[in-house]
């Protein structure tokens, strides 16, 4: 199991079996992160959808938005989202990520976690429209939150990493095949976190 002390935060691959993960702790400096946080918070077309869990319908415990450079919808957990046009601000962030990913992303799913009660349950980003072995680029602004992973078969394999404001976290290779991930609720006093997950819809 990976020792948290092994996380260098400089993009060095993290040593988890069946996963390809990279973490850049300070990909954006503090001023950049604060400015992006404020602008995205104020200008995003936020929505809150209903979601079905074990046959029961709930309001999704976070706010979301979808932007893309095309009109292709994105579906997950019974929710179908239709994208807004990619903004100049989001394209600016995407271009920065391209420099270290060599991937042309088409779409960004944005999540706003308003406080510690907002969460995102165990799941994998393995929807058909993402293709095989997708690359997901996750950018965080605002409050820090723990990102949890657990292996699908080897239940004892669990890991968590604190995603800090201004950080960039990649999930690549067979990560979505072998691992689930979540943002869990927390009783700690935390402020708003905005998370952008860039992906390629095919």
Predicted segment positions?
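Non-heme Fe(II) oxygenase metal-center motifs and adjacent flexible, charged/small-residue loops
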Residues: 1-202
């Amino acid at each position: 199991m990976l020792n948290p002390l092994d996380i260098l935060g400089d993009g060095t691959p993290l040593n988890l079996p069946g996963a390809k993960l990279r973490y850049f702790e300070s990909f954006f400096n503090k001023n950049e992160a604060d400015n992006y946080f404020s602008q995205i918070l104020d200008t995003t077309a936020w929505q809150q959808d209903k979601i079905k869990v074990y046959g029961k319908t709930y309001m999704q415990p976070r706010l979301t938005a979808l932007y893309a450079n095309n009109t292709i919808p994105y579906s997950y957990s019974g929710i179908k989202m239709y994208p807004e046009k990619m903004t100049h601000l989001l394209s600016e962030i995407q271009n920065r990520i391209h420099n270290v990913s060599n991937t042309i992303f088409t779409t960004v799913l944005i999540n706003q976690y308003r406080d510690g009660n907002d969460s995102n349950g165990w799941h994998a980003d393995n929807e058909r429209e993402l293709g095989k072995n997708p690359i997901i680029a996750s950018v965080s602004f605002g409050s820090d939150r723990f990102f949890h992973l657990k292996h699908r078969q080897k239940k004892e394999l669990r890991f968590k990493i604190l995603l800090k404001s201004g950080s960039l976290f990649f999930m690549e290779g067979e990560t979505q095949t072998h691992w689930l991930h979540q943002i869990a609720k927390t009783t700690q006093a935390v402020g708003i976190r905005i998370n952008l997950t860039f992906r390629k819809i095919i």
